[in-house]
């Protein structure tokens, strides 16, 4: 089974970013009781793990097309400052950049 590396890295980065933002906000944790411990996994999966949405975000035909993949990520994450990131000019040419 082949796992596309770039989407996995992007998703893990977003998860780390989400965790870091939650930690910086100082969210208070609830007490763990038997009632909310038993209801925890179902609520967690329904809230955070929407597999159909993730599959529609990364289509298989876009994995080899870096520009289509980058544009897809830009559409999915419009709140990031994309001008601060380096441009993908080097990926457009068939010849490698001179070093």
UniProtKB/Swiss-Prot annotation:
<comment type="function">
    <text>May act as a soluble regulator of keratinocyte differentiation. May play an important role in embryonic skin morphogenesis.</text>
</comment>
<feature type="signal peptide">
    <location>
        <begin position="1"/>
        <end position="22"/>
    </location>
</feature>
<keyword id="KW-0964">Secreted</keyword>
<keyword id="KW-0732">Signal</keyword>
<dbReference type="GO" id="GO:0030154">
    <property type="term" value="P:cell differentiation"/>
</dbReference>
<protein>
    <recommendedName>
        <fullName>Keratinocyte differentiation-associated protein</fullName>
    </recommendedName>
</protein>
<dbReference type="Pfam" id="PF15200">
    <property type="entry name" value="KRTDAP"/>
</dbReference>
<dbReference type="GO" id="GO:0008544">
    <property type="term" value="P:epidermis development"/>
</dbReference>
<dbReference type="GO" id="GO:0005615">
    <property type="term" value="C:extracellular space"/>
</dbReference>
<dbReference type="InterPro" id="IPR028196">
    <property type="entry name" value="KRTDAP"/>
</dbReference>
<keyword id="KW-0221">Differentiation</keyword>
